Swiss-Prot record:
Entry-linked HAMAP family: AdoHcyase (MF_00563)
Position of the signal peptide: none
Species per Swiss-Prot/TrEMBL record: Pyrobaculum aerophilum (strain ATCC 51768 / DSM 7523 / JCM 9630 / CIP 104966 / NBRC 100827 / IM2)
Cellular component annotations (GO), alphabetically ordered: cytosol
UniProt pathway annotation: Amino-acid biosynthesis; L-homocysteine biosynthesis; L-homocysteine from S-adenosyl-L-homocysteine: step 1/1
Gene name as annotated: ahcY
An annotated GO BP: one-carbon metabolic process
Protein name: Adenosylhomocysteinase
Residues where substrate binds: 54, 125, 170, 200, 204
UniProt keyword tRNA-binding present: no
Lineage: Archaea, Thermoproteota, Thermoprotei, Thermoproteales, Thermoproteaceae
Reactions that this protein is recorded to catalyse: S-adenosyl-L-homocysteine + H2O = L-homocysteine + adenosine
Length: 437
């Protein structure tokens, strides 16, 4: 097995330039790296990181390596790898198995590659790595496991789990999968749900996805957003962020489709229209899914859309839009721009799908800005340190609040922002039950 496999090693110089730019905008992670270089809290650990291979991820991986870890980096999406960054990291001694445009077989070969290094900590974005490990642990043999074994060789499940101390998960989608695994009684090692940290979801999910989703839509289409009717499926933190930016870009109508009555009510109070997708399909110009669920936009919805409707997905997996159904019924299909395909329906209408229905911000753009990933990946680095220092029972955990607040404090410090502190009198007041009216 080679130490790394990337698309083109000659891209490494350009990748180093990308990493340099990211590091200029990720001061919190660099401060953590400086401490890691001295303390080596990850010494002796092998971290298998299944993440989008971007310049920001590269800064995280360098930080983990500075902490003493041996790092194996594989992609969490077949289309999101930045090949120049992958090449640069491979030259630095990171074990990288990633390139843009992987087939399903190659994608799961990458997971097998990571497992061949016998990881002690897993780091996931969408839970594909963790789910695969659990399939092996529970004796499941499907086609994806066959692909894994092509590069991992024969795996001793008991030995694999005896070495894994714990894992982390970056996304809402991944946390949902892992909590389902826990609920079924099949979770085999502890997981820290990084996505549940305030300094992750309040910033990454809302501001990061809000900006990068529209970056992807505009790069793919070069359309003017002002004056358009925008339909957003899902009003979690990702949907909120997309809606905020749609309004800021001048969308004529921002329509939210939501199944949760509390979130739907919140969307109404935030000033957006709320309606079912059946109705929204008839009036929308641009549709963006952010639900984490299957077929938020069904084939029936697509047939109701205007001629020229644009479809994009901001959720982790390419299941939120019924792409398979669209492929099946379309009478014609052609690529008219990079990452933009035109489908002609039997009724003569045309719809435009961005990035095969995969993550629009990473397929058609570069993902989240470095400044916001500084927070998310600071959480990832500190979660890895927490796992290395603490033996946890099998469960899905939130990162301790003191770590979450420390990330926020460091970010404010690097931004040159000071905050107020409680006086001693105020501390006594809020800790007393006797004082009142």
């Amino acid at each position: 097995m080679p130490e790394s496999r990337v698309k083109d090693s000659s891209l490494a110089d350009r990748g180093r330039e990308q990493l340099y730019w990211a590091e200029l905008n990720m001061p919190v992670l660099l401060e953590i790296r400086r401490r890691f270089e001295k303390e080596k809290p990850l010494s002796g650990h092998v971290i298998a990181a299944c993440l989008h291979v971007t310049k920001e991820t590269g800064v995280l991986v360098r930080t983990l390596a500075a902490g003493g870890a041996e790092v194996v980096l594989i992609p969490s999406n077949p289309l999101s790898t930045q090949d120049d960054v992958a090449a640069a990291l491979a030259q630095e001694g990171i074990h990288v198995y990633a390139w843009r445009g992987m087939s399903e077989r190659e994608y799961y070969n990458a997971i097998g590659f990571a497992l061949s290094f016998n990881p002690t900590i897993t780091m996931d974005d969408g839970a594909d790595l963790t789910a695969t490990i659990h399939k092996i642990g529970h004796g499941v043999r499907d086609q994806t496991i066959e692909y894994v074994l092509e590069t991992a060789g024969s795996l001793d499940a008991a030995g694999l789990f005896s070495r894994i101390r714990g894992g982390t998960e970056e996304t809402t989608t991944g946390v949902i999968r892992l909590k389902a695994l826990k609920k079924s009684g099949k979770l085999l090692y502890p997981i820290i749900a990084v996505n549940e940290s305030y300094t992750k979801y309040l910033f990454d999910n809302r501001y990061g996805t809000g900006q990068s989703t529209w970056d992807g839509v505009m790069r793919a289409t070069n359309l003017l957003i002002a004056g358009k009717n925008v339909v957003i499926a899902g009003y979690g933190w990702v949907g909120r962020g997309i809606a905020i930016r749609a309004r800021g870009l001048g969308a004529r109508r921002v329509i939210v489709v939501e199944v949760d009555p509390i979130r739907a009510l919140e969307a109404v109070f935030d000033g957006y229209e709320v309606m079912p997708m059946d109705k929204a399909a008839e009036v929308g110009d641009i549709f963006i899914t952010a639900t984490g669920n299957i077929r938020a936009i069904s084939l029936g919805h697509i047939f109701k859309m205007k001629d020229g409707a644009v479809l994009a997905n901001a959720g982790h997996f390419n299941v939120e839009i019924d792409v398979a159904g669209l492929e099946r019924v379309a009478v014609a299909k052609r690529r008219i721009r990079p990452y933009l395909e035109e489908y002609t329906l039997p009724n003569g209408k045309r719809v435009y799908l961005i990035g095969e229905g995969r993550l629009v911000n990473l397929v058609a753009a570069e993902g989240h800005p470095s400044e916001v990933m500084d927070l998310s990946f600071a959480n990832q680095a500190l979660a890895a340190e927490f796992l290395a220092k603490n033996k946890l029972s099998v469960d899905v955990y939130k990162l301790p609040d003191e770590i979450d607040r420390e990330v926020a404090r460091l970010k404010l410090k690097t931004m040159g922002i000071e905050i107020e502190e409680l006086t001693e009198e105020q501390r006594r007041y809020i800790s007393s039950w006797e004082l009142g009216t």
